[in-house]
Amino acid sequence: MSAEHDQIRAVAWTGAGVRLLDQRRLPQEEIYWTIACVSDVAQAITKMVVRGAPAIGIAAAYGVVLAARARFSEAGSGWKQLLEADLCDLEAARPTAINLAWALARMQAIIQGLPDHRDPESALLVEARCIHEEDIAANRRMGELGTTLIEGSVGVLTHCNTGSLATGGFGTALGVIRHAYGKGRIEKVFADETRPWLQGARLTTWELLRDGIPVVLIADSVAPYLLGQGEVQWVIVGADRIAANGDTANKIGSYGLAVAARYHNVRFMVVAPTSTIDWNLSDGTRIPIEQRPPEEVLTLGGKAIATVGAEAYNPAFDVIPAHLIDAIVTERGVVRQPTHERMKALFG
């Protein structure tokens, strides 16, 4: 895969802090913030300055570095006790994305092995950078594996944003699209707008065009009609949490796409690193679903679009039943027609 289709990094460590591309401002403005305080990292996650399950985990890992730096400076050998509250704040920032808890668990393992009197920053920074670099490597591997499932030159539909903006780099579902496009396996990419935050319209179109990949934007409600027209052979999405049986939580609207894809005999691919799998959950009914503020539905661009007094229901995610998924692609391999037994067979 040539570098020309992978130019964006939404999360980076600068030494002074964690550098985040403010995804709320795209595509109108490209603004980067350097954040030096762990509470501001947690707020950036909650307010969706940074979003996408892998990117959230990476940002949180760097947030732990900032917290440890501050707590050791403040309390010396008592830094671990003060750090506990910071870790709790980070984990509570977004409840559905399991990558957040996974990254924090890795950082906590390093913390537990450090002596109280030692400055923890360098050891924690090494681990945070490993999490970041491993994510990029996993995404590139998933891009290769996902491409092997795509035959000929096809049309694909993707949902939300699952590229470099949502990860450490390259992307999950968009990583497959990037790699397959570079190999001549994809003729046309459709992206749906993804209400209410419009990640498809604002972020996916920006990212693909920035990296030289043509894209066609559709309204969310167009997707089932499009799938019935024969122009799309694969729907390719990411994931925020995958249960042990393959049930997959992803951005709201994914379940409806899976239903429409099955009805029209269009194949459905989920692309996510193994850190997204929650082996403690037997199925998707136990996945916690984040409820976002009603204002996100009742307003658009800061202006009211609904009559005063109307209420709004705003779950951020829904769950795709495993039987509607043709393949789950991870960096460790592909699970076709996922079940608990097939998931366990691949991952042991």
Swiss-Prot record:
Q: Which UniProt keywords apply?
A: Amino-acid biosynthesis, Isomerase, Methionine biosynthesis
Pathway membership of this protein? Answer: Amino-acid biosynthesis; L-methionine biosynthesis via salvage pathway; L-methionine from S-methyl-5-thio-alpha-D-ribose 1-phosphate: step 1/6
Catalytic reaction annotation:
5-(methylsulfanyl)-alpha-D-ribose 1-phosphate = 5-(methylsulfanyl)-D-ribulose 1-phosphate
Active-site residues annotated for this sequence = D240 (proton donor)
Per UniProt, where does substrate bind?
R51, G52, A53, R94, Q199, N250, K251
Q: What's the Enzyme Commission number for this chain?
A: 5.3.1.23
* Matching InterPro entries: IF-2B-related, IF-M1Pi, IF_2B-like_C, Initiation_fac_2B_a/b/d, M1Pi_N, NagB/RpiA_transferase-like
One GO term under biological process is:
L-methionine salvage from methylthioadenosine
Q: At which residues is there a site annotated Transition state stabilizer?
A: C160
User: Molecular function (GO) terms listed?
Assistant: S-methyl-5-thioribose-1-phosphate isomerase activity
Q: What does the sequence similarity comment in the record state about its family? A: Belongs to the eIF-2B alpha/beta/delta subunits family. MtnA subfamily.
Record's function text: Catalyzes the interconversion of methylthioribose-1-phosphate (MTR-1-P) into methylthioribulose-1-phosphate (MTRu-1-P).
* Record-given protein name: Methylthioribose-1-phosphate isomerase
Q: From what organism does this protein derive?
A: Nitrosococcus oceani (strain ATCC 19707 / BCRC 17464 / JCM 30415 / NCIMB 11848 / C-107)
Q: What's the source species' lineage?
A: Bacteria, Pseudomonadati, Pseudomonadota, Gammaproteobacteria, Chromatiales
